[in-house]
Amino acid sequence: MSLNSEEDEAELVQLQPRYNGEDTSATTNRELNGWYAYPIAAEVFAVVAVGAFLPVILEQLARENGYFFSDSTKSCVDHGGSRRMRAEDGLKGSEQCMIKILNSTISTSSFAMYTFSAAVIVQAVTLVCFSSFADHGPYRKKMLMAFAYTGSVASALFIFISPTVYFLAPILVIVGVTSLGCSFVLLNAFLPLLVANHANNTGAKFATADSSSDFELEALNPNTQCGQSHARSAHMSSRGVGYGYMAAVFVQVISILILWLFSKTAIQKRHPSLPIRVILLLVGMWWAALTTPTLLWLRPRPGPPLPSQEAKTLSAPTSRFRTFLFYTRFSLRSFWRTLLRAISLRQTLMFLISWFLLSDAVATISGTAVLFARTELHMGTIAIALLSITSIGSGIIGAFAWPRVQKRFSLQPKTILLCCVAGMEMIPLYGLLGFIPLFKKLGFIGLQQPWEIYPVAVLHGIVMGGVSSYARSVYAPLIPEGSEAAFFALYAVTDKGSSAFGPALVGWLVDHAGSIRPAFIFLAVLVVLPAPLLWMLDVEKGREDAKAMADGEGRGRGTYERVREE
């Protein structure tokens, strides 16, 4: 990072402002470091907390208040001592633990699944209502900081959630997951601005007479500049993700050390949930502390005003509450208009439906795998943390490997997604092998032994690397030019909102079956559902339809097309 970043900034040519209040100052290394700092801060919560320990802590807190599925008189945890009662009095090791919530009896695994379904619904609604804050007005950075610190506090507060107040844990999970999703949407809203004001885009260093010809050539060949911007955007985005994953692996290793240290003491035997609560406190502190560089270095970069606000004058100020309501109404109207436009584009709609199903399947398998390892395979928290690291490491390998596979065999991005669906389908099918009598007699194959889940985690990570890398690549050509922000907002809501249904249905199945394993039947069906839609998807036809819509509407107005709608 340059110590003279402010001087460097002064030397860079600024773009002409497109609206009143736009910050067109050139992007500096200091600002880029501020943007990169946030994935390092927040990705730790996404991977370590959401991906590993939140499902475990929810199940553990509920278990300490629960009773066995086949005998409601026996507690799942012997409160008179430290001994677990899973196998006592002839009870099977796979016995599910049940708990009463609001006059309903659910399993402790379902308690975690239902909580995440509720969190996803709240997150999706919040994303829809707050989308205009990401694109318009001076609130982008303020909202980013608000969500970041709210989420970090929610994670840290788990240190106070003992089994006696376990019903407060879902509230903190919902707040944390919602804050995480909304903060990343707000962070991503900075990306096109940082790219647009990058030194190489603004004619870096000094504007001289000799450089005018370059600007003229660039104007005659806008696709070259567009391609450079897309490449730079992809590079910055991938670096942010890479930094975030490295930070997550680092904190996960620290978490394993914490769990190991607690396992050597008598504290864990008396308070089984305490080590995980300490880890969540650490994650919250990490999130808050590493957000500080973003707070200090990332410029606010105000967005364009909303259309109706352009006519307002300073002589007619509005209250904060009325401004909030105005932004929310605009967000809902904008989302509804974008949804109607997407419905009129057959190929775009087909992809969004397939992505809805695929995203739901991916999220459901991830959550179910952790709880299956916890309740059916009886794996400890250290083993689950190692499982998370295995999946993350494989995901990084997959992200690098799939492009090589695509280049080697000249595959289309859609084909890569179909390969990922096929790989994901192998996971529930392998779990179903545990129902076959021959394999049941062997005692392994079909996820009957803890070690079997690690190769499954490798497969899951590799497949996830492909899904994460190629879903946007397939979707991008299907968007009308000039509507990128609106359609990617729809993509984000489809991604986040879909994950509410699969976990809830798995929870319902577990409640009625008394075991997670039968849910593999549902997962096998859920994973394969998007495959026919992806197979029928005609990307070239979708590209032509999107271009025709943009030409018919006279668009091509860039990132801020929603500013001038209506």
Curated annotation (Swiss-Prot):
Q: Keyword Glycoprotein: yes or no?
A: yes
One GO biological process this protein is involved in is:
autophagy
**Organism domain of life:** Eukaryota
Q: List all membrane-crossing ranges.
A: 38-58, 110-130, 146-168, 179-199, 242-262, 278-298, 351-371, 382-402, 416-436, 451-471, 488-510, 519-539
Its placement in the membrane is given as: Multi-pass membrane protein
Q: Does the keyword Secreted apply?
A: no
Which UniProt keywords are given for this protein, alphabetically ordered?
Amino-acid transport, Autophagy, Glycoprotein, Membrane, Transmembrane, Transmembrane helix, Transport, Vacuole
Q: Could you tell me which InterPro entries the record lists for this protein?
A: Atg22, Atg22-like, ATG22/LtaA_families, MFS_trans_sf
User: Cellular location of this protein?
Assistant: Vacuole membrane
Q: Which Pfam families match?
A: ATG22
Q: Which Gene3D superfamilies match?
A: MFS general substrate transporter like domains (1.20.1250.20)
Per the record, GO CC terms? vacuolar membrane
- Return the annotated region ranges for Disordered: 547-566
Residues with an annotated glycan are 103, 200
Purpose of the protein: Vacuolar effluxer which mediate the efflux of amino acids resulting from autophagic degradation. The release of autophagic amino acids allows the maintenance of protein synthesis and viability during nitrogen starvation.
| Family per similarity comment | Belongs to the ATG22 family.
Q: What is this protein called?
A: Autophagy-related protein 22-1
What species is this protein from? Phaeosphaeria nodorum (strain SN15 / ATCC MYA-4574 / FGSC 10173)
